[in-house]
Amino acid sequence: HMPFNLVYVDSPHGGMDGGCSSAAGVPEKGINLNILLNLRDLLSVSGYEVVVTRDTDRSIHDSGIEGIANQKSSDMDNRLAIFNERSNAVCISIHQNQFTDPKYSGAQMFYAPTNKDSERLAQKLQGSFHTRLQPDNDREIKQCGKELFLCYFSKNPTVMVECGFLSNPEEAARLTDEA
C-alpha cells in the first residue's frame, strides 16, 4: 500500500515537439494531452489532488531558449521540477509506443529502479490495464535506466505509461477516438 494523496500527470510532447505519429498522421502529443485531461478529471472526481505538467498544446521550456534540442531539454527539466515539487505523490507520464512492425499492441508500464515504489506502481497499473481494458494484453512491466529521464530522476514513485502502439492501425484508431 502506497499512501499518497497527490497525483502528478505528465503529457510529454507539446508545442513544436509532436512525438511520434500514427499511420493516419495523428501526432502523439494530442493523444497524450487528451488522455491526460480525461485522467485528470477522473482522478479529481475520485478524490485525488491532481497536478498536470501541461493542459494545453505547448512546451514548458524556459523563455529565451533557442533551438529545438535545448527547448526539449528545458521542457524535460521543468517537468521533472514539477514532479519533485512535493512528496507523498505518485507520478504518471503518458506516452504512446511505436514499432516498425504494426502487429504489436497493448499498454506497457516502465519504471526506474531509483524508487522502490515505482515498480509496485507499475505492477498495479499494468494489472489494471489487463483486468479492466485489455484482457488479452500479456505485456510485462519493464525497468528502464537514465534514458527515461523523468522516471529515473523523479523523487516520487513514477511510471511511464505507454498506452498503446500508434504503429498498430486498430489501436491507433481506438486511442485517437477514445481520447
Region roles according to the model:
Residues 80-88, 126-128, 165-178:
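Short, surface-exposed, charge-dense and proline/glycine-enriched linear segments
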